[in-house]
């Protein structure tokens, strides 16, 4: 029994080190756009989990939403953050990430292995209301981050293509409201910038 426990401890340590690499995997979209000090995949998933935690939608299983947010990009600790600009077919991206998730979860006891893999699969297949909500959080968090980079660089509108890529993808009322508020703020910033002399 002590041996099994020691083995699972070693597996857990390897698992934690592996997912810890997400802190050092930059989000590729920002790298390609030459954003200074781009966020990590881990940064992105953390705020998504917080966004899930503060939802007021009682129809959703909030705990499950948080778990989905924390697992959805976990494979990127092995495969990296594959962006649309990488021109890797969706099926190939899925295959790589599926292999990575199998590799990652093999380090865990069977019950946890099953739970994490099934959460990842649920998100990938969008097979629940929670998965669909978290997918919208993923897109919403991205444009929120884009607006913050525009503010930090004092270049309103520079990352417009990230907004364009999410057009028509939001349907959950809370997220629609949040995005509307974000767009109002951003439009005001862009209007101010264009009104400044020399702009």
Curated annotation (Swiss-Prot):
Pfam entry (one): HD_3
UniProt keyword terms in alphabetical order: Acetylation, Hydrolase, Magnesium, Metal-binding, Phosphoprotein
Co-factor binding details: Binds 2 divalent metal cations. Shows activity with Mn(2+), Co(2+) and Mg(2+) but shows no activity with Zn(2+).
The UniProt record lists the keyword Acetylation: yes
Positions bearing Phosphoserine: 5, 199
EC number, UniProt record: 3.1.3.89
Domain of life: Eukaryota
Group of enzyme by EC: hydrolase
Binding positions for a divalent metal cation 1 per the UniProt entry: 44, 72-73, 138
Gene3D superfamilies the UniProt entry points to: Hypothetical protein af1432
Cofactor: Mn(2+); Co(2+); Mg(2+)
GO molecular function, one term: metal ion binding
Signal peptide per UniProt: none
Modified residues (N-acetylalanine): 2
GO cellular component, one term: mitochondrion
Binding site for a divalent metal cation 2: 76, 81-82
Catalytic reaction equation(s): a 2'-deoxyribonucleoside 5'-phosphate + H2O = a 2'-deoxyribonucleoside + phosphate
Domain HD stretches: 41-143
Tagged with keyword Transport: no
Family: Belongs to the HDDC2 family.
PANTHER family membership: 5'-DEOXYNUCLEOTIDASE HDDC2 (PTHR11845:SF13)
Function: Catalyzes the dephosphorylation of the nucleoside 5'-monophosphates deoxyadenosine monophosphate (dAMP), deoxycytidine monophosphate (dCMP), deoxyguanosine monophosphate (dGMP) and deoxythymidine monophosphate (dTMP).
Assembly notes: Homodimer.
Protein name as catalogued: 5'-deoxynucleotidase HDDC2
Native source organism of the sequence: Mus musculus (Mouse)
Primary gene name: Hddc2
């Amino acid at each position: 029994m002590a041996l099994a426990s020691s083995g699972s401890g070693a597996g857990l340590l390897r698992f934690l080190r592996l997912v810890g690499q997400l802190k050092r995997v930059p989000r590729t979209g920002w790298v390609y756009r030459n954003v200074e000090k781009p966020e990590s995949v881990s940064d992105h998933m953390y705020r998504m989990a917080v966004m899930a935690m503060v939802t007021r939608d009682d129809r959703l299983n909030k705990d499950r939403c948080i778990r989905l947010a924390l697992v959805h990009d976990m494979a990127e600790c092995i495969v990296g953050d594959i962006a649309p600009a990488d021109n890797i077919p969706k099926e190939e991206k899925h295959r790589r990430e599926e292999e990575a998730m199998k590799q990652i979860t093999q380090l865990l006891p069977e019950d946890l292995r099953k739970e994490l893999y099934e959460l990842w699969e649920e998100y990938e297949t969008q097979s629940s209301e929670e998965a669909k909500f978290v997918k919208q959080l993923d897109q919403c968090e991205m444009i929120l981050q884009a607006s913050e980079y525009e503010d930090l660089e004092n270049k309103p509108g520079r990352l417009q293509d990230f907004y364009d890529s999410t057009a028509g993808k939001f349907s959950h009322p809370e997220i629609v409201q949040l995005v509307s508020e974000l767009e109002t703020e951003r439009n005001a910033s862009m209007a101010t910038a264009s009104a400044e002399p020399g702009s």
